[in-house]
Amino acid sequence: MKTIIAILYAHLVKRQNQKWIDNPIKWQTNTFKKLIKNGIKTEFGKNHDFENIKSYDQYKEKVPVRDYEELRPYIEKVVNGEKDILWPGKPLYFAKTSGTTSGAKYIPITKESIKTHIRSARDALLNYFLKTKNFKPLNGKHMFLQGSPELDKKQGIYHGRLSGISAHYVPKLFLRNRKPSWTTNCIEDWEEKVEAVIQETVGEKMTIIAGIPSWVQMYFEKIVLKEGKTISQVFPDLSLYVYGGVSYEPYRQIFDKLFGKSIDTLATFPASEGFFGYQDQFNKDYTDLLLLLNNDIFYEFIKAEDFLSGKYDRISIKDVELDVNYLLIISTSAGLWSYNIGDTIKFTSIDPYRIIVSGRIKHFLSAFGEHVISEEVEKAMEVATKLNNVAIREFTVAPKINPIDMLPHHEWYVEFENFPEDMSAFTKSLDNEMINQNIYYKDLIDGKILKSLEVISVERGGFNNYMKSVGRLGGQNKVPRLSNDRKIADKLKTINA
């Protein structure tokens, strides 16, 4: 019965979504007009003359691009209980995240925007079922490794992790078969929580597991160690792994080993600020994401190269080009206006609009003018691990600026699952692929400004130790792939000494 309902619902959703997929520019134009209309009587709208904005060009003249720190004065008013500041009324929630220079970020979630988060997660699964004809996951247990659903309250507004907020909106179709229990989900200590999740899930008919790869990996490894079996032996009905927030490629080899068999994966692009995309095709090795244009989000784009050099020229979706690295800018029904979320994307298709997430604008390495981005180091690692039959657990890249008796270079801190037989060959593979991808890096190597990169092995569990030491173990927290300073590198050296 559940399968029949899902099939009918999936076909209905497909027809609804096809309307905006077939008319993307029209939908974005209508979204723009709708957002401006709703924002006219807000404090932000009055300060930026929304009443007289009739076109996108006028909007760009009146509303600058802002990041969280620049929008903070408005958000603080909302946090303090004031209404009609960024969006009519007050938000339902604040998604609390870490990562700013002045403490936690509070991202508003309104009654309009929460619906788009939930609908997108639902649509991603329904699309998967319809495209693959695999409805078996519906007839089993589903595990979502996430933050605590216990929410704090401030000025009458609940706040917590986005994944914890979303736990209050699980569709009835999935609620009965959901794991872990509410009590276990509320455990704050991550390692204790994983142990409790294992107790609740081993022996159950698990068919869907979702979560950030690094933390699901920890969960899987503890099960394999405890049971002495592969994941597919422990969970023979498991047929779908859903992830978001990071590239799966660096984890693919180790997950294949843990699974012990091939398993379907579903890539998504959720964030506290909005749900931006999900994988809509399931050919081999295909993980491009359909950009969602029906979520009350108006998208703008700035070439990442321009942004890093101080030029903020932005365009709407009708002017984007393929294979250009863009910084993603959003205006939403949560009251974020031309907001820089920090993610960079590339378009792989414009009919329909599909993207890959190429990295974080703040997670780049350009200590020597090389402009290296996350996508490049992940691609280099993918190539090097395949060429050298290596599996890795985690890695990050940092600059070595003033070494003694040698040229500056990049240091790659790598936690290996299995070590290369020839470390110098592995290192050479990484360096060659970076040279192939990044012309600036090649010029610096050829010009003897930089020497070839160096690989530094991190002891087993080293990255988890690092994340624990900075209070970011578990949940939606991720290790940055690269940085322009040595904070992570030096900390890794200290705790792994």
PLM feature segments, named:
Residues M1-E51, Y59-R66, P73-K77, G81, ...:
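Active-site glycine/GP-rich loop and adjacent strand/helix microenvironment
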Residues T31, G89-K90, S113-L125, E192-K193, ...:
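Short, glycine/acidic-rich beta->alpha junctions
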Residues F94-I107, V455:
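Conserved adenylation A10 loop of the ANL superfamily
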Residues A104, I114-K115, F419-P420:
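Short strand->helix junction
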Residues P108, E112-S120, Y241-V242, T265:
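Long, hydrophobic, well-ordered secondary-structure blocks that form the structural core
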